[in-house]
Amino acid sequence: MSQNILLLIRADIKAVDEKVDALQQAVNDVSANLPDTSELSAKLDAQATTLDTIVTQVNNINDVLNPDLPDVPGNLQKQQQQKKSNKK
């Protein structure tokens, strides 16, 4: 009777071993079929760099088209208003 139990245990171990082998093969297949993300990462990094360059250029254009003008001092502002009213 103890031999029968040992045979059953041995058969169970063999079945588990076969399942582990099948699972390992499936893992190997999945690993082999994973896409290479390094190329995709490199392309995304290049696009991010290009986007940063474009943003910088747009900001420079915006600064040129919309410069910060200093406030006109009070006495000059009055003179300009008087000139405008004299022209009318």
UniProtKB/Swiss-Prot annotation:
Keywords: Late protein, Viral occlusion body. InterPro entries: NPV_P10 (IPR008702). Residues 65-88 are annotated as: Disordered. It comes from the Viruses. One of its GO terms (cellular component) is viral occlusion body. Residues 77-88 have a biased composition (Low complexity). Pfam families: NPV_P10. Seems to be involved in the morphogenesis of the polyhedra. Forms extensive fibrillar structures in both nucleus and cytoplasm. It is involved in the liberation of polyhedra from infected-insect cell. Belongs to the baculoviridae p10 family. This is Protein p10. It comes from Spodoptera exigua nuclear polyhedrosis virus (strain US).
